[in-house]
Each structure stands twice: as C-alpha cells, then as structure tokens.
Amino acid sequence: MALWGGRFTQAADQRFKDFNDSLRFDYRLAEQDIEGSVGWSKALVSVGVLTTDEQQQLERALNELLIEVRSNPQAILQDDAEDIHSWVESKLIDKVGNLGKKLHTGRSRNDQVALDIKMWCKAQVTELQYAVRDLQAKLVETAENNQHAVMPGYTHLQRAQPISFAHWCMAYVEMLERDYSRLADAYNRMDSCPLGSGALAGTAYPVDREQLAKDLGFAFATRNSLDSVSDRDHIIELLSTASLSMVHLSRFAEDMIIFNSGEADFVELSDRVTSGSSLMPQKKNPDACELIRGKAGRVIGSLTGMMVTVKGLPLAYNKDMQEDKEGIFDALDTWHDCLTMAAFVLEDIRVNVERTREAALKGYSNATELADYLVAKGVPFRDSHHIVGETVVYAIKVHKGLEDLSIEEFRQFSDVVGEDVYPILSLQSCLDKRSAKGGVSPLRVAEAIADAKARIAAKK
C-alpha cells in the first residue's frame, strides 16, 4: 500500500517501483519504526486526535507486531511495501482496521525516518562501545602476558629503538580509547529527537515534543524542523568514527601481518584465524588480518559516499537521503565484525620472545643510548649524534654491535668513553631509561596496563 496515491492518476511503473523502493534494506529499522509509532500514538492522545482507549489498542497491536518482527525480521522482505513505514502501517491496519489509519496524523515520513535512523544509530553506538572495550581488554591481557618480550620498535620500517611487545599492544589500547570517546561524543550529539518536525515546517498539532523526546529515550527535542528532517550529521559522524577506527585496526592488522611473516617471525597466529593455499601445501596465510586491512577501504568508502551525497542538497528533505542507510548499515556491521575478529586474532597468539629479542639486538637500536651517554659526559648532543653516527658506520664495517666494540675502538671517535658504557648499551638499560610517563620502561608499561584495566572496568 502506497502512502501517497491520491495525487496520482496512474500507478507507478514497476521499473520505477523497483528502483525507488527501500524495504529491502530499511527493514532493519522495523523495531525503531514501531517504537517511534508507539511514542507518537501517546502524543496524539495529548492533542485529542486519539482517545486513551484507541491509543492502548494501537499500542497493543504495535507491540504484537514488534514481537513478530523480533522473532523473524527477514519475513518483512516477503512483502512488496515501498518502505518500512508503509509496511508497519499496513500491518497495523490489518490488525486494528481503520483505527490504524489515524496514527500518521501530524507525522511525515521525513521526521519518521529521521527518528528511526537516529534511534538505530544510538543503539549501534552502545554495541560498538562494547566491542571496542572488549578488544581493549584483549590487548591489555596480551600486553600483561608479554611484558618481558623485548622487540625492535620501528620508524620508516627500520629498527629504531627497543620496545616491548606489551608497549606495542598498549599503543593500540590508546587508539581504541579515542575511538570509544568519539563514539560517546557522537552519541551525545545525536541524542535529540526529530519526531514532531513534520515534513519540514513542524507539525500542526501542539504536541509536547520534549515529553515525546523523553518517551523515546532522547535527551531533548530538536530545535529546528528544517534541520531536523534534513540532518544526517549523526550518520556522517558515525561513519567518520568508524573510518578512523578502521584505520587503527588496519594498522594493527598490518603490524600483525609483518610480525607474522617468515622474515620477522615475531608472532605465530593460530590455525583458527589463518588459511592455506590451494596450490602450496606449506602456506599459512594471515587472512583474518588481511581482511581487516582490506575492509578498512570499504568503510572509508561509505563515509566518502555519504559526504558526497549530502554536500549539495538544498533544505530540507530530498530522496537522495534514502542513500544514507545501506552505507551506514554495512559500515557499522563491518566495523563491529573487524573489532570482534581483531580480538579473536589475539586469543591464541604466540609471541616468539627469542626471535623478538634477537631482532632487538640488531640494527644498532641502542645507538641513541650511546649518544645520551656522551651527553652525560659533557658532549653536546649535536656533536654526540655525529660521533655515534660515525661509530655505527665503523661497527657495520667490522660486523660488530656497538656493545661488542672495545674501549679502544670507541675512543677512535670519542675519548670520554669508559668501561661504564657497556651497561648503558644493554637492552634492559635501553628500556629502563625510558621512564617518563608513556615510555617503554617496564615500570611505566606495568602502570599503563593497570590504568587501562581500571578504565576498561569502569566501562562495564
């Protein structure tokens, strides 16, 4: 049943109907559409459109429909309704007859769909925060179990300075903390109810929109009807948050792929998250991580598509806005799946501590410690930097690590070097000295783990 047929003398062509109809994807808003309709029925009582008995009859029927939807949401797709609003109204009329035709009084599909998608987005934020929190918890657990696994830290994908695997894990905990915070911020900005804004100019019925907002779980009612029905900021903001978080997850996945490679051999991924080759029997491919990395582009594409869709739209509602749903549905589903899979990847990960330590000992990653040692001896840092650079060139030439050079060899470059240089050049010393807040010293890493555990516990 179309909701707009009276103006037309011909039926819509089936080709247009197939092109125009949105039930095949907006059926996912069924619960929100029904809950919004219950709220609107109560508002109509307050302005005399419905009696209390009529409202109660409508609410009972809507609640019955809600139970049916929750038990089998896919059944909606068997209908040929134009959209989820048409479907709900037709099913309501089937249950209560002509009384169901009164429910849309004073309401437009424009404010109705704006409400539905906001309610859906709010629910998704909560679920996504749980998923972010759970991945943080798994990273913290992995860090706690690998506090003594020393590995090289990288810049430009070249060995730079020693870090611990735990410190690496905690870096991603911090990225996810910002993602969690952005979700909370986005929730606060979308917590305004557009219902009662009508098509664009507001409803002609003097409903108490603040009470309506509270009934539907919002903090307050929107302030401008034009903005209310055309606002898709909350979708774009969620897509932006999802995209940035997927960038974080993609970097995590890329690190894991590198660490898992035969060349690095820092970690071994479980058989449960890897696959083989149809040709090469020896292969064990990090498919879970590669898919996370690949899906980042898909989510970012949804953000780009939505921004381009709305950038030139005049106020207020335009049918272009129907394109908001498939992108946000797919992007948030994908993000949630990737958060869950990243946590699963960490469940059975094995860190090759001997290999990571061996790699940390190579690449002259203790060169900065030697420069700091010279500074402590009174050499200006810029000079010490140059001296150590020359020393590294020499060490490479003679195939030695800095810690393997003799005092005589050191003194070819600086006569202030003494026997006390050797403890400074050890991996443990390199870690221990980085003891400022946020540093890689074991003490600071342990503090970071404890702090993160407290923050995660508070999110429950």
Swiss-Prot record:
Its EC number is 4.3.2.1. The keyword Glycoprotein does not apply. InterPro entries: Arg_succ_lyase_C, Argininosuccinate_lyase, Fumarase/histidase_N, Fumarate_lyase_CS, Fumarate_lyase_fam, Fumarate_lyase_N, L-Aspartase-like. Keywords: Amino-acid biosynthesis, Arginine biosynthesis, Cytoplasm, Lyase. GO terms for cellular component: cytosol. GO terms for biological process: arginine biosynthetic process via ornithine; L-arginine biosynthetic process. Pfam families: ASL_C2 (PF14698), Lyase_1 (PF00206). CDD domains: Argininosuccinate_lyase (cd01359). It comes from the Bacteria. One of its GO terms (molecular function) is argininosuccinate lyase activity. Gene3D superfamilies: Fumarase/aspartase (C-terminal domain), Fumarase/aspartase (Central domain), Fumarase/aspartase (N-terminal domain). Pathway: Amino-acid biosynthesis; L-arginine biosynthesis; L-arginine from L-ornithine and carbamoyl phosphate: step 3/3. NCBIfam families: argH, PRK12308.1. Belongs to the lyase 1 family. Argininosuccinate lyase subfamily. This is Argininosuccinate lyase. The gene is argH.
